[in-house]
Amino acid sequence: MAAATMALSSSSFAGKAVKLSPSSSEITGNGKVTMRKTVTKAKPLSSGSPWYGPDRVKYLGPFSGESPSYLTGEFPGDYGWDTAGLSADPETFAKNRELEVIHCRWAMLGALGCVFPELLARNGVKFGEAVWFKAGSQIFSEGGLDYLGNPSLVHAQSILAIWACQVVLMGAVEGYRVAGGPLGEVVDPLYPGGSFDPLGLAEDPEAFAELKVKHIKNGRLAMFSMFGFFVQAIVTGKGPLENLADHLADPVNNNAWSYATNFVPGK
């Protein structure tokens, strides 16, 4: 029998029956019981969501014009803009979408890592070097570089040691995500959930859909922020918070335009 209805005759459960669904249990001919995991189908999003569907928010609002036919508003962050036609091919679009989401996450972590040590240093926490693009040079100092300032964790005086640690730390997480977790239970490697969602933020489908939009929007801002940090480091040789403090102290002489004019030929 593929499914069975078992009447429980104990005194505490008299008169009650438990039905084992074929999707959750099977009784084979040799008496073994096999269990299968059932996946609950997500509820469809409400048609009133401003971020999805044909009536979603567009990149120029009411002046956006008609979106390309392949941008249907199915995915978060789709504002109907693809001038270069990068999303026309479904396979290319899927690949680029994954690349964007992953780069968004690294950029958000990177932007936090660029600002937070400098913020702590300005509030009395001692660092060997708090400015993000100067921190790596500590491996060439006499004392080397200690992870988290603790010499008992990783004491590095070699670029290869730093590289190896990054490969292990970053590669392990990415490998875990792409492989679908330790048991291969992850359905969507872009939004794996499970161990990656300990707070259960993805349990409600509508709230999760909105979080995806916030996630991609903040990630795009973070990528622009990282680009700005790179340019600031090259032009001013200072960290982002120091540049901000200089601008607030003297906005007339410390701004993008004043630095750009320094590169005018003949000046």
Curated annotation (Swiss-Prot):
<keyword id="KW-0007">Acetylation</keyword>
<feature type="modified residue" description="N2-acetylarginine">
    <location>
        <position position="36"/>
    </location>
</feature>
<dbReference type="InterPro" id="IPR001344">
    <property type="entry name" value="Chloro_AB-bd_pln"/>
</dbReference>
<feature type="binding site">
    <location>
        <position position="214"/>
    </location>
    <ligand>
        <name>chlorophyll a 5</name>
    </ligand>
</feature>
<feature type="binding site">
    <location>
        <position position="183"/>
    </location>
    <ligand>
        <name>chlorophyll b 2</name>
    </ligand>
</feature>
<feature type="binding site">
    <location>
        <position position="220"/>
    </location>
    <ligand>
        <name>chlorophyll a 1</name>
    </ligand>
</feature>
<comment type="similarity">
    <text>Belongs to the light-harvesting chlorophyll a/b-binding (LHC) protein family.</text>
</comment>
<keyword id="KW-0602">Photosynthesis</keyword>
<feature type="binding site">
    <location>
        <position position="105"/>
    </location>
    <ligand>
        <name>chlorophyll b 2</name>
    </ligand>
</feature>
<comment type="subunit">
    <text>The LHC complex consists of chlorophyll a-b binding proteins.</text>
</comment>
<keyword id="KW-1133">Transmembrane helix</keyword>
<feature type="binding site" description="axial binding residue">
    <location>
        <position position="103"/>
    </location>
    <ligand>
        <name>chlorophyll a 2</name>
    </ligand>
</feature>
<dbReference type="GO" id="GO:0046872">
    <property type="term" value="F:metal ion binding"/>
</dbReference>
<feature type="binding site">
    <location>
        <position position="87"/>
    </location>
    <ligand>
        <name>chlorophyll a 1</name>
    </ligand>
</feature>
<dbReference type="GO" id="GO:0009416">
    <property type="term" value="P:response to light stimulus"/>
</dbReference>
<dbReference type="GO" id="GO:0009535">
    <property type="term" value="C:chloroplast thylakoid membrane"/>
</dbReference>
<dbReference type="InterPro" id="IPR022796">
    <property type="entry name" value="Chloroa_b-bind"/>
</dbReference>
<keyword id="KW-0157">Chromophore</keyword>
<feature type="binding site" description="axial binding residue">
    <location>
        <position position="232"/>
    </location>
    <ligand>
        <name>chlorophyll a 5</name>
    </ligand>
</feature>
<keyword id="KW-0479">Metal-binding</keyword>
<keyword id="KW-0150">Chloroplast</keyword>
<dbReference type="GO" id="GO:0009523">
    <property type="term" value="C:photosystem II"/>
</dbReference>
<feature type="binding site">
    <location>
        <position position="177"/>
    </location>
    <ligand>
        <name>chlorophyll b 4</name>
    </ligand>
</feature>
<keyword id="KW-0809">Transit peptide</keyword>
<feature type="binding site">
    <location>
        <position position="158"/>
    </location>
    <ligand>
        <name>chlorophyll b 3</name>
    </ligand>
</feature>
<keyword id="KW-0603">Photosystem I</keyword>
<feature type="binding site">
    <location>
        <position position="263"/>
    </location>
    <ligand>
        <name>chlorophyll b 5</name>
    </ligand>
</feature>
<feature type="transit peptide" description="Chloroplast">
    <location>
        <begin position="1"/>
        <end position="35"/>
    </location>
</feature>
<dbReference type="Pfam" id="PF00504">
    <property type="entry name" value="Chloroa_b-bind"/>
</dbReference>
<dbReference type="GO" id="GO:0009768">
    <property type="term" value="P:photosynthesis, light harvesting in photosystem I"/>
</dbReference>
<comment type="function">
    <text>The light-harvesting complex (LHC) functions as a light receptor, it captures and delivers excitation energy to photosystems with which it is closely associated.</text>
</comment>
<feature type="binding site">
    <location>
        <position position="256"/>
    </location>
    <ligand>
        <name>chlorophyll a 6</name>
    </ligand>
</feature>
<keyword id="KW-0812">Transmembrane</keyword>
<keyword id="KW-0793">Thylakoid</keyword>
<feature type="binding site">
    <location>
        <position position="166"/>
    </location>
    <ligand>
        <name>chlorophyll b 4</name>
    </ligand>
</feature>
<keyword id="KW-0460">Magnesium</keyword>
<keyword id="KW-0472">Membrane</keyword>
<dbReference type="GO" id="GO:0009522">
    <property type="term" value="C:photosystem I"/>
</dbReference>
<protein>
    <recommendedName>
        <fullName>Chlorophyll a-b binding protein 50, chloroplastic</fullName>
    </recommendedName>
</protein>
<feature type="binding site" description="axial binding residue">
    <location>
        <position position="154"/>
    </location>
    <ligand>
        <name>chlorophyll b 2</name>
    </ligand>
</feature>
<feature type="modified residue" description="Phosphothreonine">
    <location>
        <position position="38"/>
    </location>
</feature>
<keyword id="KW-0604">Photosystem II</keyword>
